[in-house]
């Protein structure tokens, strides 16, 4: 089993852990939806993802910034869905 942890912000990242909690890989958030998909594709078999559930934008952010974050989060969710990676929001 491989565990995928995602901090969904544009300045967030993705961590991959093995069964024993050892870090396999830890990367800054890929820049494009295709890069996100391609990275996650390497870990689609026998994996589960914990995706940080960020319910709203940051206080003081503009509406366009909040929309950009929501779109980016949607790209993450769709990549996980398309690859069949079980996802838990926490």
Protein language model annotation of sequence segments:
Residues 1-90:
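Phosphate- and other anionic-substrate recognition elements at nucleic-acid/protein interfaces
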